[in-house]
Amino acid sequence: MGQRGWPPEATAIVLHDALGRWPEELGFQPPVGWIRPEAHQEADVNRPTFVSVTAAALVPGPTAAQHVDPALISYFQEQLEGHYRADMLLGPHDLIGTVSAQYQLIDKLVRSAQGETRSGLLRVGAAYAALVGWLYQDAGDLGAASFWRGITQEIAARSRDRHLFGYSLVNLAQVRTDLGDGYGVIDLCEAALVDDRLFPKVRVMAMQQQAHGASLVGDRTAVDRLIDVADDLISRVDDDLPWGNACRRTPGYLEVQRATCYGRLGLGREAESLWSQVLDAVPATARRDRGVYLARHATAAAGAREPEQAVDIARAAVEIAVETGSARMRRELGILEKAMRPWHDAPVGRDLAGILASVNEGS
């Protein structure tokens, strides 16, 4: 808390980011011992970026009390479904600000709501935080993604909803997957699966993510076992929760995961065969996901010693990568570039370099 008439440090930082001036430059009388945040020794933190990432989740209180209509819960749930659809079409950059602002509003309402209305808002708030985390992850900012995955876990714990809490652990495991920490992924997914009362959807999510962890540590047997068990469960996914529905929205969801794991394990021919089947079922509306799958398919073709096919597939992936700005897609194309190194000096390698130039220029 700041002294009377002097804003708390978090507010001082927001004022500076908005107006370019510190409170004492705006006429406030600084308290004894005040040190501007920029003077602290934090060379490893880009404070403006940090504040912009965290601001929606760290609003200081108290806030003014207000009546909260229970109908707002369904309103935010309906908006969430629209955001999921937009994410598939647009990619992360056009949505982060909108979804973060809605999370901030939900957080404000939670502070005034009572009883079941408050519990319902906490549950939907956790889903919004999870989506913000995913958007940052897709944009390639794993630090911001980790922060928002942590907020998801906090809100899930506050909601006392075991299914949401399990979902939040899977969210954390997704970040560990992108960090290449296979054992971290396995630990988090096993922690989620300890609770055998979880809805089938959450168990499916945890098992497929654990399969990714297994692929990172080179365990194909575990990959197949986990995907097969999840496949036995997926027909029982029948809840009406607004979050975590990729397993229902994504055609061939589990085979997508298996193909990705096989590619990571270096099983080029097996992965290439699976991607050929999976991509036939992916709708044009799932443009961002299709781009990621195409990039992985191209890498699998390279692993199967089919460089010309890899380059042909890469053309379509690059077009989508440029449109969506997905860092995840650029990362997949970077993996393809490494897989094509044996043909670096061949005409097909030069063709790939030309195709990837538009992505590399925009990164």
Predicted regions and their residues:
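Residue-level marker of regulatory loop/turn positions in helix-turn-helix DNA-binding domains and
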Residues: 4, 42-43, 251
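Short N-terminal amphipathic alpha-helices
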Residues: 8, 24-28, 117-121
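Conserved binding/catalytic microenvironments
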Residues: 66-363
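Recognition helix of helix-turn-helix/homeodomain-like DNA-binding domains
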Residues: 1-7
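Compositionally biased, long intrinsically disordered regions
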Residues: 24-74
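DNA major-groove recognition helix of helix-turn-helix/homeodomain DNA-binding modules
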Residues: 7-25
